[in-house]
């Protein structure tokens, strides 16, 4: 199933020098977002920078949201992760997509123009309506917190 999402190109290099975000395979859940920077950007150890992707989206459907997630290779191999861990794009947001990158490694990292730095995934949204109660029905877990269910 494909759902139409409005996309605005904010950087003219997208669609000419660099492809539009797209799914790499039929089974891909995310589309790569690229660093639309003007020159190579070195991210120092411990530094967090905000990187433009060159696009804006308008999801419009309140039953959907988009999330910006890290690319596994950047985090595992280079220590580059999202500064906010995950970015949530509400259905009514229409501004530019930016990616917060944090270098959690001990080495500087050079981000090149057009590098793939994160992925965009669309997810269903359920808006909850709270029902006030004095007590919960019992469950197997109850109030057991962190580590309660064990490791085996």
From Swiss-Prot:
Enzyme Commission code(s) on record: 3.6.1.23
One GO-annotated biological process of the protein: dUMP biosynthetic process
CDD domains given in the database record: trimeric_dUTPase
Entry binding sites for substrate: 71-73, 84, 88-90, 98
Catalytic activity entry: dUTP + H2O = dUMP + diphosphate + H(+)
Keyword Oxidoreductase listed: no
GO MF assignments: dUTP diphosphatase activity; magnesium ion binding
Cross-referenced HAMAP family: dUTPase_bact
Function (record text): This enzyme is involved in nucleotide metabolism: it produces dUMP, the immediate precursor of thymidine nucleotides and it decreases the intracellular concentration of dUTP so that uracil cannot be incorporated into DNA.
Stated name of the protein: Deoxyuridine 5'-triphosphate nucleotidohydrolase
Protein's organism: Shewanella baltica (strain OS185)
Lineage of the organism: Bacteria, Pseudomonadati, Pseudomonadota, Gammaproteobacteria, Alteromonadales
